[in-house]
Design a protein with these regions (language model features):
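Single, function-defining residue in the core of a domain
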Residues: 2-291
């Protein structure tokens, strides 16, 4: 199984740059929000909308924020059925809430949240409620203990499925926006995330997808006495054009690397027997090509 690179885009410190490139800003609850997390979620939403297929987005704890969940829940098909869900690792200090109590006859606004739960403490408080299962992780069977809880996540204001996982001495918490996805499937989905790192290594060290050398004098040099702020160029049409062309060239170069990597992955999956039969080199250890 491969992690196929589909798209590459500049996301770090690009608020003004995206305006120069005439790119839309992600909307979170009707308000524009440009950040690394919101831009990634918007890019994933665009890809899934174009595919028109149900997908699961697997991310690390950096993206366990409400704007990501809010953007992804907007991706729907023509029948208003949700197409995109997220599986991510939760931050260690995550808290959630049980359902609020039923409205009583007492005056006052009804409660929106129930009992507050610090999920990291549940590993000790409810250790006897954990279930044991065997899941194939990284090609090998692995015995894990888990506890699945559907709780209200306050930043989103909705229920999220939390899966507390005990892997030997390691403890971690997963979050999933799909309340119908089983805990073992959530754990299995998250195990595929490491393949992203493998693809990054191929893109960087084998394909050279990030070895671009595009620059423009309209872009300020970064030094002790300078800043990378692009606001100085906002009134200069020529500088805007040069900077946007440079950014487009950088993104195009990286995307061509993604396309080339994807082609090589397709070839290796479909013609691996021919590749090995024509391979002229010598390897100290040759693994089974079917693995």
């Amino acid at each position: 199984m491969f992690c196929v690179p589909l798209c590459a885009e500049l996301h770090e410190g690009v608020a003004i740059l995206r305006q120069f490139q005439d790119k839309a800003e992600p909307l979170v609850y009707g308000h524009a929000k440009v950040s690394v997390t919101s831009l990634m979620a918007a890019m994933a939403a665009d890809i899934v909308s174009a595919l028109g297929k149900k997908c699961i987005l697997v991310l690390d704890a950096y993206f366990a924020v409400a704007p990501v969940f809010a953007i992804l829940q907007q991706v729907q098909d023509d029948g208003c059925q949700r197409l995109l869900h997220i599986v991510t690792r939760a931050k260690s200090n995550v808290v959630a809430y049980q359902d609020p109590p039923l409205k009583s006859a007492m005056p006052g606004r009804p409660r929106k949240y129930g009992t507050k739960i610090r999920l990291i403490q549940v590993f000790e408080a409810k250790a006897e409620h954990f279930e044991q299962t065997i899941i194939e992780l990284y090609g090998k069977p692995k015995s894990l203990c888990f506890l699945c809880l559907d709780l209200i996540w306050k930043p989103l204001g909705k229920k999220v499925r939390f899966v507390l996982v005990a892997d030997g001495s390691e403890r971690f918490i997963l979050m999933c926006s799909d309340l119908t996805l089983s805990a073992p499937d959530i754990i299995l989905a998250y195990s595929y995330r490491f393949k992203i790192e493998v693809s990054f290594k191929v893109l960087k060290h084998l394909m050279g997808s990030f070895f671009y050398r595009f620059w423009t004098h309209a872009w300020p040099r970064i030094g002790k006495q300078t800043t990378s702020d692009l606001s100085h160029a906002a009134e200069d049409v020529r500088k805007i054009r040069l900077i946007s062309q440079t950014a487009n060239a950088i993104e195009a170069f990286a995307n061509f690397g993604c396309i080339a990597t994807g082609i090589l992955q397709i070839i290796s999956l479909n013609f691996y027997q021919t590749i090995w039969s024509k391979y002229p080199g010598w390897l100290r250890t040759i693994m089974d090509p079917e693995i």
